[in-house]
Structures are given as C-alpha cells and as structure tokens.
Amino acid sequence: MSELFSERIPPQSIEAEQAVLGAVFLDPAALVPASEILIPEDFYRAAHQKIFHAMLRVADRGEPVDLVTVTAELAASEQLEEIGGVSYLSELADAVPTAANVEYYARIVEEKSVLRRLIRTATSIAQDGYTREDEIDVLLDEADRKIMEVSQRKHSGAFKNIKDILVQTYDNIEMLHNRDGEITGIPTGFTELDRMTSGFQRSDLIIVAARPSVGKTAFALNIAQNVATKTNENVAIFSLEMSAQQLVMRMLCAEGNINAQNLRTGKLTPEDWGKLTMAMGSLSNAGIYIDDTPSIRVSDIRAKCRRLKQESGLGMIVIDYLQLIQGSGRSKENRQQEVSEISRSLKALARELEVPVIALSQLSRSVEQRQDKRPMMSDIRESGSIEQDADIVAFLYRDDYYNKDSENKNIIEIIIAKQRNGPVGTVQLAFIKEYNKFVNLERRFDEAQIPPGA
C-alpha cells in the first residue's frame, strides 16, 4: 500500500510557506495570526519548520522577531547552516511585498498539512486492514477516531503547565462567582436536584438505576426534554429498548400534559388536540436526536456522537439502558466484565466529548428480598466497575411501587448514593404517571396537574 504513494510528492506549497515566514520578517505582528493557525510541523520543508519554531521561541521570550534575532536563535541551536544560512533568511525577508495576506498564506499551508496527515492516516488504516486481526468494530472505531483527529486538527496531548491551568481555573471560579444561581453544569430542570448536583457536569458519567416500571426512562426523558427545550444544548438519546416513536409519544405526553392512554388509543378530546399541537411545536424546535438501534456497541455510540458534536454540537448523551449495550467481544470471560468495559468506555466518552453521559441501569432482584426496598450499590446488575467509573449514581425509589397503601403516593425519591464532587442525599419529586412526567415537589399541590389515581 505504501508503494502507491512512494513515488508521489505529498501535497505542499513551498511558496506559501516562504510567504508566511517572509511576512513575519516584514511585520513581526504577523506572527500572531500565523501562530493561531499553524504549528511548526505544519510546514512541509524541514528548514521552514525550524525557522518558524525559532520565531516562536524568540517571541515567547518577549524579544522582537526579526532577521537578526531569528538568525541568532538558529545559530545558538546550531541549526543556521541546516536551514540554508543567513542568505536564505534574507531571501525569505524579500519573499513578499506585504504582510497583509499572511492569514491567507497560512491557510494554504494548513490545508496542505491536513492533506498530508490525511494521507498518512489513510495509509495507516489501510495497513491495519491488511495486517491487524482485531474485531472489525475495533478497527472501525480506531479508523473513525483517527479520521476525526485529522478533521479537528487536534494539537492536544502535551503536558499542561500548572500556571496556565491556574489562570484558567481562576477565570472559571470568577465566572461562577459572578453568575446568578448555583448551577455550574447543565441544569436538569429539577430545582432540588440541581441544588444538590449544581447541574450535571460536563465529562461526568451519571448512572440512573431503578427496578423496572419505577420511572427511570421517564426521568431521563424529562431531563433530556428540559435541557433541549430550555437551553441551547443538543441531546443525543440512544434507546436500546423502545423505538424512537415510542419515546416521542412519551415526550409528547410530558410536554403537553396529555394522558398517555388517550394518546396511545387516539381517543383525544378537543383540549388534548390543542395540547398535542403545542407539544409538537415545542419539541420540533428542540435539539433532540434519537437513535433506536438495538444492541448497539459503544464504538457505534462514540462514532455517532463524535459526528453529531462536530456537525451540530452536543450537550448531553442519554443511554437507555446500559446492560443492553453489546460488548466489544474482546472480553472472553463473562458479561460482568463486558459491562465493566462498557462503563469505562462511557466514562471515556464523556471526557472526550466533554458532555454529561446519563446511562440508565437495571437493578438486580436482590432488592426485593430486603425489608427496606431502597436500592444500594450492590443492587446494580452486572455492576463490575460501574460504581468506580460513575461520577454520580442515582437510584429511583417509589414507596407506592411496593406499598399500595403508602402515604407517599406519586412521590419518587432520587437517592444520590454517590457524587464524586458533591454531597450525597435524597431529593423528592412528584411523579405524574399518566403524563410520564416528573415535577418539582412544590408544584405537586397544584392538584389540577395530577389526574385522579396518578
């Protein structure tokens, strides 16, 4: 495969590279826009890489960038003769009549650099296809990651000096101090929950676990709706259990306060039709993207979310539910190890895309054997490393689910059993089952909201 490209000259524009360097010699201020677009490795000719690097070092010391200082810098690093000597630097200084077009020239250099990296990446992918014996999904995931890195021009990965991090951290603290409210992450729309968590933080993995039919899907959908309709964030929902149409039916009920049974059967009153029209209008303007592929792999989730973030932006990911995600096949032991691998991958995804990932989880039947049915960490099915990977573990508990005579009808407890960077505790919400909707508890006493028998 490499022979295909061995006799071809890689994409490059020596003239544009010379124009960039010449513009900096002509006007040192041109280094600012040039350095915002280019790094030394973007230059094709090795001599140009060294010259641009020398310019950056001189500028970093606060010295003027000109023919004299750059010559001295290259001489000090014993690179002056390697780049062609003072005579070549003088040629560069006379290469352009004006520095006004430096950004245009830099874009040409950048474009050629991206093409070269793309060729190298494609060659590497093709070579892997011939020689690697990994699972096809592993190869596809790696290929997608490599291509995305090229398209995003990632120059990250180096060490970060703590002084730079401290400056960014101080600016962030100052911003938080000056903003209204206590929310530092993405608001869920539930007052007490947001107060306890400060909103769901970017890069966090949030596990929401409950027994079947307690309301975890409705809870996650409510959060997704609140985020998508009340903020500018887009939400990606992966539904492995229900179809996209079933999810949207639930969303319409919650958004329009429409009885779910009436909507399922089509027996809508004139008032319901009005509510449905308003709910459809609200949701159609929301940035909600649904994928209902069953038995999807984490690699597929990652690839689709990377693409969505690049094309439209992404603020949150919801997965219903974790145990239905298909393993990579690399774990030869048992399903628990596969689920552990999946949870680690979801945490890595949250960090990579800098969005909160909400993953729903089933609970084992062991919770049914206890006097107190409130869930515990050990109740998470095939838990493995889920507890370790998660930044927040939230259990949903309804007393009236187990006790039909409960005094706390329609009340659901959101038990924050783990919060890596915050307190643990319990938040109560009202659950309007007919609407598939959770509301803040202070609104529960507006009886008009809650149908009889909810």
Swiss-Prot record:
Q: What is the effect of changing Q362A?
A: Partial loss of helicase and ATPase activities, ATPase and helicase partially activated by DnaG primase, wild-type ss- and dsDNA binding
Q: Catalyzes what?
A: Couples ATP hydrolysis with the unwinding of duplex DNA at the replication fork by translocating in the 5'-3' direction. This creates two antiparallel DNA single strands (ssDNA). The leading ssDNA polymer is the template for DNA polymerase III holoenzyme which synthesizes a continuous strand; ATP + H2O = ADP + phosphate + H(+)
Location of region: Linker helix: 163-176
Task: List the GO molecular function terms.
Answer: ATP binding; ATP hydrolysis activity; DNA binding; DNA helicase activity; identical protein binding
Location of the region described as N-terminal domain (NTD) in the Swiss-Prot/TrEMBL record: 1-149
Supply the EC number(s): 5.6.2.3
According to its UniProt record, this protein's enzyme class is: isomerase
Tell me which residues are marked as the site Gamma-phosphate sensor: Q362
InterPro entries in alphabetical order? DNA_heli_DnaB-like_N_sf, DNA_helicase_DnaB, DNA_helicase_DnaB-like_C, DNA_helicase_DnaB-like_N, DNA_helicase_N/primase_C, P-loop_NTPase
Entry's Pfam families? DnaB, DnaB_C
Active-site residue numbers: E241
Q: Which residues bind ATP?
A: S213, G215, K216, T217, A218, R250, Q362, K418, Q419, R420
Keyword annotations: ATP-binding, DNA replication, DNA-binding, Helicase, Hydrolase, Isomerase, Nucleotide-binding, Primosome
Matching entries from PROSITE patterns are given as:
DEAD_ATP_HELICASE (PS00039), SF4_HELICASE (PS51199)
Q: Where is the SF4 helicase domain?
A: 179-445
Is DNA repair among the key words of this record? Answer: no
Where on this chain does ssDNA bind?
R381, E382, G384
The UniProt annotation puts the region (C-terminal domain (CTD)) at: 183-454
Could you mention a single GO BP entry for this protein? DNA replication, synthesis of primer
The source's domain of life comes to Bacteria
> Anything else of interest in the record?
The gamma-phosphate sensor residue (Gln-362) may sense nucleotide binding/hydrolysis in the active site; it is also important in DnaG-induced stimulation of DnaB activity. Other possible gamma-phosphate sensor residues are Lys-216; Lys-418 and Arg-420.
**What's its job?**
The main replicative DNA helicase, it participates in initiation and elongation during chromosome replication. Travels ahead of the DNA replisome, separating double-stranded (ds)DNA into templates for DNA synthesis. Binding of single-stranded (ss)DNA to the hexamer suggests a 2-nucleotide step size for the helicase and a hand-over-hand mechanism of DNA unwinding. Has ssDNA-stimulated ATPase activity. DnaG primase stimulates the helicase activity (the helicase direction was not determine but is probably 5'-3').
- What's the subunit arrangement here? Homohexamer. Interacts with DnaG primase, as DnaB(6):DnaG(3). Interacts with the N-terminus of DnaI (shown with DnaI of B.subtilis), forms a helicase DnaB(6):DnaI(6) complex. The DnaB-DnaI complex is disrupted by DnaD (DnaD and DnaI from B.subtilis). A stable complex DnaI(6):DnaB(6):DnaG(3) fragment can be isolated; DnaI and DnaG do not contact each other (DnaI in this complex is derived from B.subtilis). Forms a complex with DNA clamp loader protein tau (shown with B.subtilis HolA) tau(3):DnaB(6); a single ATP hydrolysis even is sufficient for complex formation.
Q: What is known of its domains?
A: Within the hexamer the N-terminal domains (NTD) form a rigid ring, while the C-terminal domains (CTD) form a looser ring; the 2 rings stack to form a double-layered ring. In a complex without DNA or bound nucleotides the central channel varies from 25-50 Angstroms in diameter. The NTD interacts with the helicase-binding domain of DnaG primase. In complex with ssDNA and an NTP analog forms a double-layered, right-handed spiral staircase with a small internal diameter; 5 of the 6 subunits bind NTP. Closely contacts 11 nucleotides of ssDNA, the 5'-end points toward the NTD staircase.
Q: What is this protein called?
A: Replicative DNA helicase DnaB
Q: Which species is this UniProt entry from?
A: Geobacillus stearothermophilus
Please name the gene that encodes this protein.
dnaB
